[in-house]
Amino acid sequence: MHLQLGASNGTLLDGSESWGEVAEGALASWNSGMTNMRFTVIRDSTSALGYGNSANNVFFSSTVYGEGWASRTLAVTLSRTNSNGVRLEGDVIFNNNLSWNSYRGPLRSSTGGGTLNDFRRVALHEFGHVLGLG
């Protein structure tokens, strides 16, 4: 997984120093329960971003490869398969138009109202899609 998440604005609520650290923890959680497959992490990757580039890009963006975000969409996973259904790529894009942090426990409210989006919780969910779940 090519982590290209950039820096956080200081220490996150869970004590993590970066989005990459949180994403690596989420991937490690998946790895701890799998025996026939493992996620491999490339932190701060410089791989080109793009659907169809055979790299599993993980990044924040204001669009989904140029398309606007649907209302209230936190993140998307875009999977590409070959004609036999074999997965070739799974990109995870987080909506950077929203407020993010990383924390444990119940959902929290953001200072501007609404829910403070928990990056770790959403990353765990999206990485499940990379595996083909849901």
Q: PLM ranges: what are they?
A:
Residues 1-134:
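Zinc-dependent metalloendopeptidases
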